[in-house]
């Protein structure tokens, strides 16, 4: 189970309980052998206590931006922005998921040229991200408007392969 901090608060007017700003992602596998590409989803984190061994950084690197290490991700994801109106990936779909969220799932659980299936495609985010990451994809959606949005986004993905928050293979 992965918890995604959606930043899209639900129950804004709730007076009898906590507002929900989390979404659950259930990650399931079948059998003992499955794909999990840990190195593909490591995160770049700022080092608070930079240890050295023989004068050299122990498990971190220094750059002009500071001291960072690549770390294994946890099952709580709070580094993902919901698509805002000004972001190129944004559509008017009420539950659109961010490309970065889907990218983490696809990179962790598939390899290049693998097939990714989304039986409830909505605005097509899964197919768009699969295409940008070199995967094959099948999107299924019954709403004609959402299908049109998805088709446009897939065409746009030919021109723009960037995923907000994912740069040079690092989140």
Regions found by a protein language model. Name each.
Residues 1-149:
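Core catalytic lobe of class I
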Residues 151-171:
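S-adenosyl-L-methionine
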């Amino acid at each position: 189970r992965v918890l995604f901090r959606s930043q899209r608060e639900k129950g804004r007017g709730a007076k009898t309980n906590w507002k929900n700003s989390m979404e659950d992602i259930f990650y399931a596998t079948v059998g003992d052998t499955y794909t999990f590409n840990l190195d593909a989803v490591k995160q770049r984190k700022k080092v608070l206590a930079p240890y050295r061994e023989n004068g050299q950084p122990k498990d971190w690197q220094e750059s002009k931006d500071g001291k960072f290490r690549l770390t294994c991700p946890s099952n709580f994801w709070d580094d993902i922005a919901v698509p805002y109106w000004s972001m190129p990936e944004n559509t008017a779909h009420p539950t659109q998921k961010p490309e970065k969220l889907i990218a983490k799932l696809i990179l962790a659980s598939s390899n290049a040229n693998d097939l990714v299936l989304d039986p409830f495609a909505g605005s097509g985010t899964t197919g768009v991200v699969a295409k940008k990451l070199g995967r094959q994809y099948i999107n299924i959606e019954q709403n004609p408007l959402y299908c049109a949005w998805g088709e446009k986004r897939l065409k746009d993905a030919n021109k723009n392969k960037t995923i907000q928050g994912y740069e040079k293979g690092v989140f």
